[in-house]
Amino acid sequence: MAPAEARGALPGWISVLGWGLALCSLCGAGPLWSGSHEWKKLILTQHWPPTVCKEVNSCQDSLDYWTIHGLWPDRAEDCNQSWHFNLDEIKDLLRDMKIYWPDVIHRSSNRSQFWKHEWVKHGTCAAQVDALNSEKKYFGKSLDLYKQIDLNSVLQKFGIKPSINYYQLADFKDALTRIYGVVPKIQCLMPEQGESVQTVGQIELCFTKEDLHLRNCTEPGEQLSSRQEAWLAMEASTHGMMVCEDGPIFYPPPTKTQH
């Protein structure tokens, strides 16, 4: 179940290497898309811990609610590597950070390394916007958007709960579009050898740069340059995810270690 504090906030409305890179703090390769670090939208990315754990095959217990992966400006990364992460800047947010933005793979280690990675790679670019121009603002606003979206409760409202039975991708799409009024991006782990169905792992909802209002993640007729397409392809492969295909989809229940 989702933590109680995250409910009721809606106003009406994922290879081992891949995930290791996505959640590490020592990723040295720079992005293909650098340019002037300009970006057009923010992507609030939430992932399903049981799927993350399935991919890396290293978690003992998985959380049973969607958690934050990051708040990412599209097309821009590592905008200011001299702007170092300082845990003291977000000490007032730590309680919520530990609940809603955990490192789901390395839960018993220094979880702040995950936050450091997200700040250096994404937060320093998001800081172009006044509402996100400090560590505290970036992480605080990310938490606010997470609670506002309240993905856990929305899926449950439509009867979409972790199950050994399969859903259709359309079940997820229809529920999210109906509540949020925008087109999200739903990402899956593709079936491995011996498997017959994709596994949902990540959901992205996008926001405008100017006022942080919900918007479609992809607009009809939107054209990307070959460089931007290469950047997006690299991002997807790094996270071990691909856009889900139409058809059946597995929403895996959490796993618990027998003690």
UniProtKB/Swiss-Prot annotation:
Glycan attachment residues as annotated in the record: 80, 110, 216
The EC number(s) this enzyme carries: 4.6.1.19
Any one GO BP annotation for this protein: innate immune response
SUPFAM superfamilies associated with the record: Ribonuclease Rh-like
Gene Ontology MF term list: ribonuclease T2 activity; RNA binding
Keyword tags: Disulfide bond, Endonuclease, Endoplasmic reticulum, Glycoprotein, Hydrolase, Immunity, Innate immunity, Lyase, Lysosome, Mitochondrion, Nuclease, Secreted, Signal
Pfam families, per database record: Ribonuclease_T2 (PF00445)
Recorded family membership: Belongs to the RNase T2 family.
Protein name per UniProt: Ribonuclease T2-A
Gene name linked to the record: Rnaset2a
